[in-house]
Amino acid sequence: MNITAEVELEILQRESFRYFIHETNPENGLVRDKTAPDWPASVAGVGMALTAYPVAIERGFIKRAAAIERVLTTLRFFWNSPQGPEPDATGYHGFYYHFLDMKTGRRAWNCELSTIDSAFFLAGALVAGEYFTEATDEEREIRYLADALYQRADWLWMQEDGSAVSMGWTPERGFLPYRWEGYDEALLLYVIGLGSPTFPLPQSSYVNWTSAYQWEHSYGYDYLYAGPMFAHQLSHIWVDFRGLQDAFMRKKGIDYFENSRRATLIQQSYAIDNPHGFSGYNAVCWGLTASDGPGPAMRQINGVKREFFDYVARGVPHGPDDGTIAPWVAVASLPFAPEIVLPTIDYFIHQIGLKAGNPYGFKSTFNPTYPCESHTAYGWISPWHFAINEGPVLLMIENYRSELIWRLMCKNPYLTQGLQRAGFSGGRLRATVP
């Protein structure tokens, strides 16, 4: 790199943290989902902000007092916000709507009460509770509210019929017809739900979730399949899965951390193979995940008719793939495979200039294949930054550098209880008495 890797990573972290400073409503702590005008807040983004403040304090990006004020504002808002079946509430049964109005904090867009986004929020609250441990009134209140918010979530209600957890609920139609079954980002959701002291999920729910797992072989690796890369990353923001194995992973002889490493290496191998012949793919230019894109559009390019998508769950190796690369998702694999991620970061920054002119580091995606007038090395680039892209960049870099979030959450008894009830053993649980 032109400057040391350590300095480059800290610059990326600082740039990503700026998102949570400038795209947050200081009156309620709500974080804008993306940088589009009049866009609502993302509950998952709030969870990442709560996780980001301890990192920012440790890195000198924000004063402790300023961070405490922001965290307290956020937790107070969510604790006191309207909970009920009304269609304009903020949440219900301790869960929260996927998107909230930035000013009022009420439900936006008739969206669903989201279990996964609520899980990310609650994980962020628990991080805050573990970090702010001083004997001041403010930090005591942070700990109290983090605990109270976590205990209020009624996971049994969201399980509904005794099988896997529902993806959500709406006042108009009740529970969504979709369940968290099969490997994805819901690994964290189940650990958090199983650890609840008030409304814990039954252990059978985790068995139901893992029963739909797909074990596959791709580019020389056996691994637990999930197409979009983010599914292999987000739970690892909060949980250090190194050495931890549930029943499924014990049979396979690996852990979820190693599985995510393999998924990262498969992403790179897929880009090198480039089976569909897209522009730009190579060993240091990869990263397919759920993201926005240049479509919807059909274009004839060099005699080939290609379809381009807007937001879609792009994935490897089965697709969909339209040549759209998400730089943030490559960065978020840093703890798993630094030997391929660091050169990729260097390429994105110094070879094709992906950060140039951006206020918050990398924008969400780019597509060198899609025809555009820029004539740059990266071709089309998304106009937007997203909270749930900026968060993993900041937080997974920190886990690589200091393991701060992992160390904080290792101390949380609810997380330990959730891991044990999911059947995990090994790793840090060896030193834990049930």
Language model: regions and residue ranges:
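Ser/Thr/Asn(+Pro)-rich, low-complexity disordered segments
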Residues: 1-434
